[in-house]
Structure formats: C-alpha cells, structure tokens
Amino acid sequence: TLANSDGQNVGEVKVFEAAEGVLIRVTAEGIDEGWHGFHLHETGDCSAVDFSSAGSHYAPDGKAHGTLTDNAPHAGDLPNVHADAEGKVAADVTSVALTVDGDAAPMMDDDGSAFIIHQGPDSYGEEAGAGPRIACGVVEAAS
C-alpha cells in the first residue's frame, strides 16, 4: 500500500518476479498531474511524516545515482511515473537489477525496502532532484 504524508491510502505497488529481475506495477491516485520520481529506498519504514525513515535510494551495489551517468544506475533508480489530469498513476516498470529476495539486490533484505513517489521528476543525472517524498509503501510479502 502507498500512503501519503497524512496516512491516507493513495495506491499500491505490486512486484512480480520475472525470469530476470522484477516487474513492478504501480497504481496511485490523488497525485499532482505530471512526472514524478519513483524509487526504491533502502529501508522498509514509512513512519516519518516526510518518509525520511525510508533512507536513501537502494544502492547495495555501490553504484551512483542516475541512469544517464557513469557508474550508474544503482538498483533503486527506476523510471519516472506520470500522473494524468485526474491525478491517477498506472505504470509497469521492469528492473533487471532488483530481486524479491536473494541475489545482489534483494528488496526483502534484513531491513526491508520502500517504494517512494516524489513530488517532481527525477533528472536521471547525478542528483535526482525529484523533490519531497509524497507517497511511501513498504515492500511486504503478499498474504
């Protein structure tokens, strides 16, 4: 479940294991129209009102931020997602760098991880520049 800073449910992220990596399906509503940074953060904790408790982008491999930079991207770098004029996000994102558990970049490691939607778009450069965190969801096993 994705929640905003008021604790309201604004969407969900579902993760499916693929032959190589994962498929990430994100749906959300109540998001300002436009492009938004979407990242996997290093700690499965959305308790802080600004979601800083989720830590930095997930980078277990030590790579730098930015799809368009050298020695990058790190595992938590994901493509921007778009909210339409009604504030709805519906996106499928793939990552060959991430795994659910095991291998080099497991989302379900000891301290977990969290998906974050940011207020603005990621620059894909050395600094994300995506602004404040507006929605957060801890990665959990499906029940």
Feature annotation, model-predicted:
Residues 1-143:
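N-terminal leader/targeting pre-sequences
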